[in-house]
Amino acid sequence: MDSILVKGGGSLKGQIPIAGAKNACLALMPATLLSEEPLTLTNAPRLSDIRTMTQLLQSLGAEVTSLQDGKVLAMSCHGAINTRAEYDIVRKMRASNLVLGPLLAREGHAQVSLPGGCAIGARPMDIHTDGLSQMGAEIELKDGYLLAKAKGGRLKGAVIDFPFASVGATENIVMAASLAKGTTVINNAAREPEIVDLVECLRAMGAQIEGEGTSTISVQGVDRLGGTTHRVVTDRIELGTYMLAPAICGGQVELLGGRINLLAAFCDKLDAAGVTVTETENGLSVARANGDIRAVDVTTEPFPGFPTDLQAQMMALLCTAKGTSVLEEKIFENRFMHAPELIRMGADIEVHGGTATVKGVDRLKGAPVMATDLRASVSLILAGLAAEGETKVSRVYHLDRGYEHVVRKLSAVGAQIERIAE
């Protein structure tokens, strides 16, 4: 099992290209199930989760071809398809549940195993299945599979009130509603850029959707969708992660493809902490002078608030801030699993339920640490960049699910980092 070795102490300078959004691509790929015409995605990230979704779609009968070293995905799904998403594939990744809505909309029935992915909280499927049930689906759980069937063979439009703004459920229902009979209105819909990206793709395929980016989305179902070519939006979580690298180490780095409007709340917190973020012709420039990082309080919220997927990385920055910071995790429970590992590096952190109190220390010290999930793994790498001595991060297979070429990208701006096989 591979590890990553980081030697801290140096500042960073240069450019890092930001990939297409993993979370957008994982929703866009199942959209091919909604049409018999080709769907091509450009700017696709090269990640293990994308390969898992490729395997899943191929198992359902879709043709998926990876071009240009994985940056282009050419997909088509014509003729009869398989409607059973098997456990052996679905268990690898939670986003596998995004085939449920498209399969049900296209074929009128589906069998989808309950999913896997990072072990962060309960993340139940109820909000997905409740929404589909309101659209006329009969759904039962049997032997670990969700068995779904549309009454009369086709889903029907409905007014759906989500109890909370779920990204995955919004994506599933929007795709299902695109081919449903009548109009579907989703209240308390998620507003993330990845949902806007999905809707723009579906609209190019012929879907009639309004309200993306707001809390109310309206979908007028159509009889069929066509094909299109669509560019995947920039990955705002990869963007935020690499913005924190010069913030932690010092120096100046330009993030190619970045935009402030993807991460406005996050950029506000960086500014409050003493980090300079400016827009450039090609992206964002992030710089930290020799001054100290200031403590800031952070509360994770649905978009446009501070992203839960950047909480662990932000904690790494605040470990050496002047003063005391409080981080409140309001999206997922059990998402401070990185804190004990940061404490091994000398951080002063106390966790009580969904709140972590971080008292800044002068400097972290390198140590052997273990990644517990995707975002925790990269937070430990960031901490290692600024630590005194050498940090060895084990179980870095998590990284491959969400970051392409992390060692190459950080090395290119001056980080001392290498991946070692064990």
Curated annotation (Swiss-Prot):
Name the positions where UDP-N-acetyl-alpha-D-glucosamine binds. Answer: R94, D309, I331
Keywords (A to Z) from UniProt: Cell cycle, Cell division, Cell shape, Cell wall biogenesis/degradation, Cytoplasm, Peptidoglycan synthesis, Pyruvate, Transferase
Q: Where in the cell is it found?
A: Cytoplasm
Q: Which biological process, per GO, is one annotated for this protein?
A: cell wall organization
Question: What pathway, per the record?
Answer: Cell wall biogenesis; peptidoglycan biosynthesis
GO CC, any one term = cytoplasm
User: Which amino acid positions bind phosphoenolpyruvate, per UniProt?
Assistant: K22, N23
Give the primary localization class: cytoplasm
What CDD domains does its record include? UdpNAET
Gene Ontology MF annotations: UDP-N-acetylglucosamine 1-carboxyvinyltransferase activity
The job of this chain, per UniProt, is described as: Cell wall formation. Adds enolpyruvyl to UDP-N-acetylglucosamine.
Give the matching HAMAP family: MurA
- Protein name, as recorded: UDP-N-acetylglucosamine 1-carboxyvinyltransferase
Q: What is the lineage of its organism?
A: Bacteria, Pseudomonadati, Pseudomonadota, Alphaproteobacteria, Rhodobacterales
Gene this chain is encoded by: murA
